[in-house]
């Protein structure tokens, strides 16, 4: 009878050890319900772009969880606007860039532009400015 208990115990331990997962399925609870924070600041590669020379403006920022984000670029003289949106935990300067185009008319001219990074589900807003030195 004792041998059966030992076998049963060993069998149950093997099942318990065999059924543990090394990786979780789906997103972590931190990324769903955790507090939002920046891991790296919002940075802009070119604060004086000359779009007539095909220069680009690239953006970079990292967060602790995936969020819906939006970069809004607004010309302070013309009122022109460009929006760039995405859902991720990172704005990668290799993927997110601006070449001077617009989302709606009028077009950008040589002017100062206000940049705003906002998040759909968070209260944080990051702001900066750049000056266009050559229009597209």
Task: Give residue spans per PLM region.
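Acidic/polar, low-complexity intrinsically disordered N-terminal segments immediately downstream
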Residues: 21-95, 101-114, 120-127, 134-136
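C-terminal motif of bacterial Sec signal peptides marking the signal peptidase cleavage site
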Residues: 15-18
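Sec-dependent signal peptide recognition
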Residues: 4-11
């Amino acid at each position: 009878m004792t041998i059966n208990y030992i076998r049963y115990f060993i069998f149950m331990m093997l099942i318990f050890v065999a059924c543990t997962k090394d990786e979780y399925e789906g997103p972590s609870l931190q990324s769903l319900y955790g507090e939002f924070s920046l891991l790296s600041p919002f940075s802009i590669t070119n604060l004086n772009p000359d779009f007539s020379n095909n220069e680009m403006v690239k953006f970079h920022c990292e967060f602790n969880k995936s969020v819906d984000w939006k970069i809004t670029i607004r010309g302070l003289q013309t009122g022109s606007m460009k929006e760039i949106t995405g859902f991720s935990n990172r704005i990668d300067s290799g993927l997110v860039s601006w070449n001077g185009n617009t989302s709606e008319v009028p077009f950008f001219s040589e002017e100062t532009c206000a940049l705003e990074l906002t998040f759909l589900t968070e209260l944080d807003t990051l702001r900066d400015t750049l000056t266009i030195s050559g229009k597209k």
